[in-house]
Swiss-Prot record:
Propeptide residue span(s): 19-41, 62-69, 90-97, 118-125, 146-153, 174-181, 202-209, 230-237, 258-265
Role summary: Apidaecins have bactericidal activity; predominantly against Gram-negative bacteria. They seem to interfere with cell propagation.
Major subcellular site: secreted
Keyword Secreted: yes
UniProt-listed GO biological process terms: defense response to bacterium; innate immune response
Protein source organism: Apis mellifera
Matches recorded under Pfam families: Apidaecin
Protein name as annotated: Apidaecins type 73
Keywords carried by this UniProt record: Antibiotic, Antimicrobial, Cleavage on pair of basic residues, Immunity, Innate immunity, Repeat, Secreted, Signal
Homology family: Belongs to the apidaecin family.
Domain of life: Eukaryota
Location relative to the cell: Secreted
InterPro entries the record matches: Apidaecin
Protein's gene: APID73
Length: 283
């Protein structure tokens, strides 16, 4: 029994402490095998040849008639289509047959009504720009053009004689009795009107009859109370400034004027004798 126990102890010691290599364990090496392009018939990866498909319809590729038979890009010849109506391309009658751009001759159309082009009677027959002679139309009412009676027949600007109209009421033009008959500016004699009340104009009795500024004699009015004007008894009758004699008023209490007993009777400044007052207590 002791002998069996000793065998077990020796076996355990040898199993635990028997590794005498002090170096750390290394990673096992992996074998790197090269690819085998010549796969044996037992390889289960099939050889796949995709079916050719046409390219996208919006991709316009040129035909490749010399493509080798082993090329899987198909030979695609797109159908010709007319260009956009807004693209006015000149016809290419000498285009080579191998060119896949179609020969397109667009129908002529008249230009925009706002585009006034001169007629081109000498245009060559191969030019697809039509010869367009626009219909004459009267100009805008606000455009006062002079009539062109001597305009040549080939000029497409119409001869327009506008109707005369009176000018704006705020535009005071002088009458033109000597205007020539071919002038389309009417002879306008405005009605006289009185000037603004705040405009004090002197009367013009000698104004000529042809002057359209009326002779206006304003009514006299008294001046402002704060305007102390001296009386003008010798004013001429034609002067429209009225003769105004203001009423005398006492001066300001703080204004100590000395009395002037020798003042002339024609002076309209009153003779004022202030009442005496006692002096200041601090003086």
């Amino acid at each position: 029994k002791n002998f069996a126990l000793a065998i077990l102890v020796v076996t355990f010691v040898v199993a635990v402490f028997g590794n005498t290599n002090l170096d750390p364990p290394t990673r096992p090496t992996r074998l790197r095998r090269e690819a085998k392009p010549e796969a044996e018939p037992g390889n289960n990866r099939p050889v796949y040849i995709p079916q050719p498909r046409p390219p996208h319809p919006r991709l316009r590729r040129e035909a490749e008639p010399e493509a080798e038979p082993g090329n899987n890009r198909p030979v695609y010849i797109p159908q010709p289509r007319p260009p956009h109506p807004r693209l006015r391309r000149e016809a290419e009658l000498e285009a080579e047959p191998g060119n896949n751009r179609p020969v397109y001759i667009s129908q002529p159309r008249p230009p925009h009504p706002r585009l006034r082009r001169e007629a081109e009677p000498e245009a060559e027959p191969g030019n697809n720009r039509p010869v367009y002679i626009p219909q004459p139309r009267p100009p805008h009412p606000r455009l006062r053009r002079e009539a062109e009676l001597e305009a040549e027949p080939g000029n497409n600007r119409p001869v327009y004689i506008s109707q005369p109209r009176p000018p704006h009421p705020r535009l005071r033009r002088e009458a033109e009795p000597e205007a020539e008959p071919g002038n389309n500016r009417p002879v306008y004699i405005p009605q006289p009107r009185p000037p603004h009340p705040r405009l004090r104009r002197e009367a013009e009795p000698e104004a000529e009859p042809g002057n359209n500024r009326p002779v206006y004699i304003p009514q006299p009015r008294p001046p402002h109370p704060r305007l102390r004007r001296e009386a003008e008894p010798e004013a001429e009758p034609g002067n429209n400034r009225p003769v105004y004699i203001p009423q005398p008023r006492p001066p300001h209490p703080r204004l100590r004027r000395e009395a002037k007993p020798e003042a002339k009777p024609g002076n309209n400044r009153p003779v004022y004798i202030p009442q005496p007052r006692p002096p200041h207590p601090r003086i």
